[in-house]
Amino acid sequence: METINAQIIMNRIEDNDVNWIYHHFSDDFQEVSSFDELTKLLEEYNRIRTTNTQYKHIHINHQDEYIWFDSKMTSGVSVTLNKYQEIISLVLIPLRHIHVSKNTKQTYTLPIVQDWLVWSGGDNVLLNSHYHYKHQRHALDLICVEQGMTYKGNPQLCENYYAYNKPILAPANGIVVEIVDGIADGVPGEINTNHPEGNYIIIKHNRHEYSMIAHIKPNSFKIEKGDELLRGQHIANVGNSGNSSEPHVHFQVMDSNDLQMAQTLKIKLHNYASPVKGDIVTYTGDNILVNKDNYFSAFIKSISTNITQIFRN
């Protein structure tokens, strides 16, 4: 088996080596990919890019993701390999930064305890899958990882995931203004698009800010609508309800409690923490610690089924 590393992959991309890249696609990825589309994509990407620098290497759940940004942060690349070193995802995109971002006025803590991995979070689409959507743009997704895996045993059972049933905490003092419960946890790998948030809670905080935590385990709420909460209070447990491919915590802060109309705010966290995809975050009850040097620097949410092309004039 040919050994592939990050430098080899990037060299082939920068050389427009379509044959080599397509040859290293998995069979499933070739079936949904076009050789001609790949040719055009590489040409367009190399037309706009500057010098690339590797940003992260992901090695988790038997998959590897490599992420690069160019020197001007105007374009980025993500390549994911399976355990056979076949390419199962390829993303080459221009990076569009939203310069007008409102920060929260008050400070929050993360709604978790102990060590969690930031699955999605940051200021571009390669780091944050929510970034295109103003009502989720600054959301964080958090998962648990042990020895390079998010689960043990059968990956189709929620209870085999390390995040499942862990406590969720109130991120700041506030009042519960909405609870949705009764939506069953889904089978990992399958999603519920009819109820994308799954079971969730919205908490009203000071200064007209509202936090929302989603994908909660059904019948695990420890509080009720109208209850006053204290920061760090146990409010529910982690589940896999809604549009969730595996048990995790979705956390965002908004300027309204209307999920369809609200805009997310960039969360000002305790200790000035600013975690992004791949960081390990630890909340001790007093401090938020961020480890940006963790080897398992991101999580592969799912195998991409298409070559992503978002180049526009």
Each predicted region: which residue ranges?
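Short histidine-centered loop motifs in beta-beta connectors
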Residues: E209-G232
